Regions:
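Active-site-flanking alpha-helical
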Residues: 24, 80, 170-171, 206
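Phosphate-coordinating loops and pocket residues in cytosolic domains that bind phosphorylated ligands
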Residues: 51, 198, 207-208
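Structured helix-beta-strand junction loops
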Residues: 56, 82, 150-151, 199
Length: 217
């Protein structure tokens, strides 16, 4: 009988938050297995999920032996520490890395994820909410684009860090799912996405996680 993988990741293909962790696992060459979560049919709201997997009712959830982690930034930090890869160099870079992870979670993917959900997966469109999120995204993506025009990696380091893996969450989903092309509209971000794609182990979210096309496992 084959040995169980070292890591398990509760995820589904449409989740950029889960993609961050799946991508990190692949980039560090971890022995891991995805566990599909039927998000769109309410699996994360089920009492069993909240009791046994994550009381917050969210994915991703990373399982490593008897340890269980939720929130993608926590998962990325844990994996970086375990592997010694994608870590910032020194205290200044560590704080800069944390600064951009927080900005990303609040202002970039924190808006991009809900915007994409409303445009593609919500039962009904909400033009007012979509317009609000799109306006915030225009400003916040512009901030990131200016940053990446000055430095190849988000934390200002000579190599990618978990800040870059965090930012990558939603940027590789098809442009038609957003109604605009991030890579073309923000050239420095576009060049950065190509640098991430060139890293050994990179895969598209729809290749890396189960559940695409929608309704499949």
């Amino acid at each position: 009988m084959a040995a169980a993988p070292e890591y398990q990741l509760y995820c589904f293909a449409q989740s950029g938050n889960a993609y961050r962790v799946a991508l990190m696992l692949n980039l560090i060459g971890a022995d891991w297995k995805p566990v599909w979560v039927d998000f769109f049919n309410g699996a994360v709201r089920a009492p069993e999920f909240r009791a046994e997997i994550n009381e917050m009712g969210e994915i991703p959830v990373l399982v490593h032996g008897s340890r269980k982690f939720s929130q993608s930034a926590v998962c990325l930090t844990y994996l970086a520490g375990r592997s010694g890869k994608f870590l910032p160099d020194g205290e200044d870079e560590r704080l800069e890395c944390l600064r951009w992870i927080i900005f990303d979670n609040q202002k970039v993917n924190g808006f991009l994820g809900p915007y994409r959900f409303l445009c593609n997966f919500a039962p009904a469109r909400d033009p007012g909410a979509e317009a609000f999120l799109r306006g915030r995204l225009t400003n916040n993506l512009g901030i990131v684009d200016k940053r990446l025009a000055r430095t190849p990696w988000l934390a200002g380091s000579a190599h990618p860090t978990i800040a870059d893996i965090s930012l990558a969450g939603y940027f590789y989903y098809p442009a038609e799912e957003f109604g605009f092309d991030i890579a073309k509209d923000y050239p420095a971000i576009g060049a950065w996405t190509e640098r991430i794609k060139a890293l050994p182990g990179w895969k598209h979210p729809y290749e890396l996680m189960p559940g695409y096309p929608l309704g499949t496992k």
